Amino acid sequence: MCGIFAVRLSQSKSVSAISEHTVNRALDAINHRGPDGKGIYISPDGTIALGHTRLATVGIATGAQPISSEDSRIHMIVNGEFYDFERIRSELQAKGYNFKTTGDSEIALHLYEEYGIDCLKHLRGEFALVVWDERKEQLFVARDRFGIKPIVYHLKDG
């Protein structure tokens, strides 16, 4: 069980950028969900923040998050477990995707690169994930079909 946290601020000039301090405070509040490490991503303009607290189960040495695409334009955080990830990983490697980790979460990133939001059709398991796609300027939030790993979100003024 990991903890994930994401914020997308409006492009309004009246809103100040997200600070690393703010993200770290949020992660401290959910640290009990993942005491084995934490990581953050903040977009250059400070309007997107992704945070992750990690409970290491698979890819213990190399599974830090957020994970990013090779071109650093797609960023993802995941709480969950993907079934049959070794087969999917092999298929993605055959298509030319390079893996930086040995964990199962990275398959979701490469499936998103390959299929976009249709990546969910290829994922089996219990999970909640958040993707920031700089190319599309899109924040994508999803969970497993049965809500085993629930996700809570809030929209304000939009």
Give the predicted meaning of each segment.
Residues 1-158:
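N-terminus-centric sequence/structural signature that marks the extreme N-terminus
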